[in-house]
Curated annotation (Swiss-Prot):
This protein binds to 23S rRNA in the presence of protein L20. SUPFAM superfamilies: L21p-like. GO terms for biological process: translation. Keywords: Ribonucleoprotein, Ribosomal protein, RNA-binding, rRNA-binding. This is Large ribosomal subunit protein bL21. Belongs to the bacterial ribosomal protein bL21 family.
Length: 102
């Protein structure tokens, strides 16, 4: 069974035991998080929400917090000999899906 959930403004397709990386969530390592914004649950009898499925939730456990690789943003203006280089590192939370409930 799989589910499509919304976490951090993005959609993820998850199964039991899968590991996902979402935008940083304020939760301690080892705690369980419940997602109730579920768009679809697939399997033998798929269900599609309008926009969400009522009384369904996905349970995930926080594995770690970290930071992604640095992304460089480079801007250049022609003929001015002007340029700007900026770096960005996004914080993330690693989650392991432990269950999908209807």
């Amino acid at each position: 069974m799989y589910a499509i959930i919304e976490a951090g403004g993005k959609q993820f397709c998850v199964e039991e035991g899968s590991k996902i990386f979402v935008s940083k969530i304020d939760a301690e390592v080892g705690t369980e998080i419940f997602f109730d914004k579920i768009f679809m649950i697939g399997g033998s009898s798929p269900q599609i929400g309008t926009p969400y499925i009522n009384n369904a939730k996905v349970i995930a456990k926080v594995l770690e917090h970290g930071r992604d690789k640095k992304i460089l943003v480079f801007k250049k203006w022609r003929r001015n000999d002007s340029r700007k280089l900026q770096g960005h590192r996004q914080d993330y939370t690693a989650l392991k899906v432990t269950g999908i409930q209807l």
